[in-house]
């Protein structure tokens, strides 16, 4: 077990070094030798884990995508646990993809660099496509379940709403990143939250009936220990 953990940690270190190089100098600056130097490893050790530069880049793209995904999943779980309205949960999810601070700005730089390379690299394109698909699925699932609980009107198409909201989010992310002075001083930043709120309000127009009942009802008996819960956007209401 310790040896496996060590191997995974080294792979993470290499992926982190790739991301550092992209953030500082761009994707074209990434070489196996520079990655090894940035990670504090020998070239031979890096090549032990990744036979080619393309393998190394693919792993780095998967790693940064997984890190963003983990934060999104945590936002959803937190929304379920605290019974937040679906629109609020989705706003929190979508802001994880927008470069509103230094860390997310670096992530955006890395993911967009890989997305550009993905135009001619099918393996990278698959990672990019999967990340976009999962986001749309999250939004569509929230809309679908919002229809069941009363937060979304019956005639709203979850798939169409997901495409619209994902497009708004991606556009805002690009506008924020383009600001030359960085996210903290960006003139676009003050508009991000109001614009997301306005777009989400078009879809999530109602109030959760279940939450309304729970606030009106007397306290219930505790849940049976061991009962399962499904941490998805739909169960936030």
Enumerate the language-model features and the residues they cover.
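Amphipathic alpha-helical packing segments from all-alpha helical-bundle domains
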Residues: 69, 103-112, 122-149, 160, ...
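Hydrophobic alpha-helical segments that form the core
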Residues: 89, 109-110, 144, 154-175, ...
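C-terminal peripheral helix-coil segments that are non-catalytic and often amphipathic
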Residues: 1, 92-98, 136-137, 141-148, ...
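Helix-turn-helix
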Residues: 13, 17-59
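Hydrophobic alpha-helical connector segments
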Residues: 59, 70-107, 158-165, 189, ...
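Helix-loop "lid/cap" segments that line or gate small-molecule binding pockets
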Residues: 94-102, 109-120, 194-195, 199
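Short, basic, alpha-helical segments at the C-terminal edge of helix-turn-helix-like DNA-binding modules
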Residues: 62-68
